[in-house]
Amino acid sequence: MNLPANTALFTPSWHAELELGYGRFDDSTRPTLRRHKGPLRVQKHLYAEGPEVCQHIIVHPPGGIAGGDRLDISATVGADAWAQLTSPGAAKWYRAASPAFQQLELHVQPGATLEWLPQESIVFSNAQAELSTRIELHGDAKLCYWDVVALGRPASGERFEHGHFQSHLDIRRDGTLLWHERQRIIGGDGLLDSPIGLDGRTVFATLLMTGEVGSELLEACRSLSMPNPVRGDLTQLPGLLVARCLADEALHARAWLIQIWKCLRPALLGREAVTPRIWNT
């Protein structure tokens, strides 16, 4: 029997959900909620820094996000708890005939700290990636959030010529907007090579950390020695520090973010930085 020519159109898409919660119990942070639907999971919680900081590694077993897929992730960190969320490898957004979505919702209660530190997102040419992130901080909650986006696959000779990458990020504290950003990058657009855009770089990264630091620490971060060419800088806004960089490789951008995170974490979050072991694998 001959198969119809459009069989590929019937490839199923994933609608995956992950809901996490964390609470403070005496001197430790423990998971209070772990619910999933579809292929999103978290591995066993870790305590590399001791019982106060609960680390979870979010995994997406299919390994990539295709057209029609939808990932919904939510996490709530209860009062005085500390959660650190990361990933074992890059998220890959594949070429597709229809959009794929990721929705992220994070809530951080008074006295709590959340670190959202995933590895990079690789957006293939012809992908249609659409991300929406909403973060609600309450009282004196603390946050460190970063993202690294790599457009195309230059090592394979693939430029980001078609498709789009779209993201929307809101951060609020007690209902007051701290940070609002919308991005839409079109494959093949002139801004990819323009000096007022990505200036020919294929990777861009952002780190946002709540709090304020003095000029001396800012200069110390700016003067960090990096072995690879990364164009980056930091800006102190009221209640929020912003660090951005452009690079030719995701590895270089991530190395820069890690250095900035190590420099700022003691002052803004109150703990020395301990690099998650998963980043070294």
Curated annotation (Swiss-Prot):
KW Cytoplasm (keyword) present: yes
Database matches in Pfam families: UreD (PF01774)
Coiled coil: none
Organism: Pseudomonas syringae pv. syringae (strain B728a)
Keywords: Chaperone, Cytoplasm, Nickel insertion
Protein name: Urease accessory protein UreD 2
GO terms under cellular component: cytoplasm
Keyword Chaperone (UniProt): yes
Domain of life: Bacteria
Subunit architecture: UreD, UreF and UreG form a complex that acts as a GTP-hydrolysis-dependent molecular chaperone, activating the urease apoprotein by helping to assemble the nickel containing metallocenter of UreC. The UreE protein probably delivers the nickel.
Function as written in the Swiss-Prot or TrEMBL entry: Required for maturation of urease via the functional incorporation of the urease nickel metallocenter.
Endpoints of the signal sequence: none
Compartments where found: Cytoplasm
MF-aspect GO terms: nickel cation binding
Chief place where the protein resides: cytoplasm
Family according to the record: Belongs to the UreD family.
InterPro entries membership: UreD (IPR002669)
